Design a protein with these regions (language model features):
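Proprotein-processing/basic-patch segments
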Residues: 3-10, 126-182
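Residues that flank catalytic or metal-binding motifs in active/ligand-binding sites
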Residues: 37-39, 68-70, 113, 136, ...
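Beta-strand-rich interaction/scaffold domains
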Residues: 3-23, 62-134
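Intrinsically disordered, compositionally biased repeat/linker segments
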Residues: 55, 171-196
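Residue-level detector of buried hydrophobic side-chain packing
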Residues: 42-43, 56-58, 74, 117, ...
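A mature extracytoplasmic/lumenal domain signature
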Residues: 57, 62, 76-78, 144, ...
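Short, flexible loop/turn elements at secondary-structure junctions
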Residues: 47, 62, 121-123, 144, ...
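A short beta-strand-loop element at or near the start of a globular domain
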Residues: 15-65
Length: 196
């Protein structure tokens, strides 16, 4: 198994879009109404399209206790590789989304600990695409479900406690027990592992 932790490394790796389709890159990700959207880009995912995604988890932290009530649906972008975000109109909402979705709803999560969201199905759906290759980018898209969503999320430009994505995956032919790869020694009932 391989565990990859992916952090944003540029302002264009996270963004938010208002109900007026305006996109902001250099600020906290502010999803504060039922018409706002969040975009998070994980660059250079190392899993191949043959990998089994054991788990994928988004971790984020609210930036203020006055804006710590998430109520979002989390998708991934349905694309072989996701482009970085831009300030172009509707740059988040215009992106195709996965069938897989996770509801993320809570109140008063605070701003001192990370919240975790299971996005395993979304990541698996993208990695299984015919055009996916190791090293491609993957974007997560958060859709505010209602007007009760009031979340300011720490971003790349926040300077610390930024969001990140963890992907635990297994490639074909890896993670096999040593005994299953051993050679049979005459007179023995179980495989004898190769030494050296």
């Amino acid at each position: 198994m391989t565990l990859q932790t992916i952090n944003p490394s540029a302002s264009s790796h996270d963004a938010w879009e208002s109900g007026a389709a305006a996109v902001t890159l250099t600020d906290e990700v502010k999803v504060t109404s039922g018409t706002a959207w969040a975009g998070l880009l994980a660059p250079s995912v190392t899993a191949t399209k043959l990998a089994t995604i054991n788990s994928a988890t988004l971790y984020y932290q609210a930036s203020a206790t006055t804006h710590d009530d998430p109520d979002l649906d989390w998708y991934a972008q349905a694309a072989d590789t996701a482009a970085v975000f831009t300030t172009g109109a509707s740059n988040i909402t215009s992106r195709s989304r996965t069938t897989a979705v996770t509801q993320d709803t809570a109140t008063s999560i605070g701003n001192s600990t990370y919240r975790s969201v299971n996005v395993t199905a979304q990541v698996a759906e993208v990695v299984a695409r015919s055009g996916w290759v190791s090293g491609n980018n993957l974007a997560l898209i958060g859709d505010a479900r209602s007007g009760s969503c009031d979340l300011w999320m720490r971003s790349y430009d926040s300077g610390g406690a930024v969001w990140y994505l963890e992907i635990d995956y297994t490639e074909p032919g890896t993670g096999q027990p040593m005994a299953a790869r051993g050679r049979q020694v005459p007179g023995m009932r179980r495989p004898h592992g190769h030494q050296g």
